[in-house]
Structure formats: C-alpha cells, structure tokens
C-alpha cells in the first residue's frame, strides 16, 4: 500500500512540476491617426502577423473568412477590430485608446471644417473619401459619432463585414 501511495504521490508531484506560469501578453496603447489612416503605424492593408507583432494581446484571430465570419484579428476588450481580408479597421464606442483628432462622441454637424463634405451620406452614417481610402463614421440618435471605420479602399470598392 505504501508503494502505491508513493507512486501516486510521485506522479502528482511530476505533473505539478511541469505546470508553467505564463505571463499574459501586454499590448502598447492603441493610437488611431484618423487623418493618416493608421493605428500605431499599422495600415488597413497590414497582415495578421504584422498586427500580432505590435499587439500580441488579441482576443480572437480568424485566419480565413467563412460565410459567417470575416478574417481578421480582434481586440474585443479594447473595442477595436482589424479586418485584414477586407482591409479596414473598426473602432467601437468602448474603444480603449487614443484617437487623433478625437472624433468619438463628436457631433455630426462639427465635422465639415475637418473632413469636408461626405462622399456618401446616409441617415446613420457618412463616408468620407480620404487620401488613404475611406473613413466611415456612424452616429447615434443624438447625432454623435459612436463607431468609425478606416479603410484603404475607395467608397466604390469598400466591402464591410456584418
């Protein structure tokens, strides 16, 4: 019986000795440059590997698009999503980072001086043609920006994920 107990205790000890502590990945602060169309110098055409190198703390990676999902690297806790196959970023209302200029929460009526007239206008969003491609701004019922998308594509070629 002692032998059995010693063998059992040895196995438990060996298994716990193999357990390793792993440090969680820490990301640098997210910095969005609206006028240049980048996030920490990453552009909408950046590949998943480039994004992972700068931001190793993603919450989900989808390598290949499917019928129900677009490929990309996602940071749900930071409310920022990189859709790599469609070449755009999406920044939500709970974004944890800096946006320059600080558009999140800005009034729809205050954008003309900065962005000019939108190329496409809808009730709840505007699409602006930028030097890098397209900036799409979404508005809440109060007319304040609550989501934005930065794409390397023109408004005519833009395809967004659902």
Language-model-detected regions and their locations in the chain:
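Short helix/turn-capping signatures at newly exposed starts of structured segments
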Residues: 18-123, 140-162
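Extracytosolic low-complexity repeat regions of secreted or lipid-anchored proteins
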Residues: 123-132
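Sec-dependent N-terminal signal peptides
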Residues: 4-13
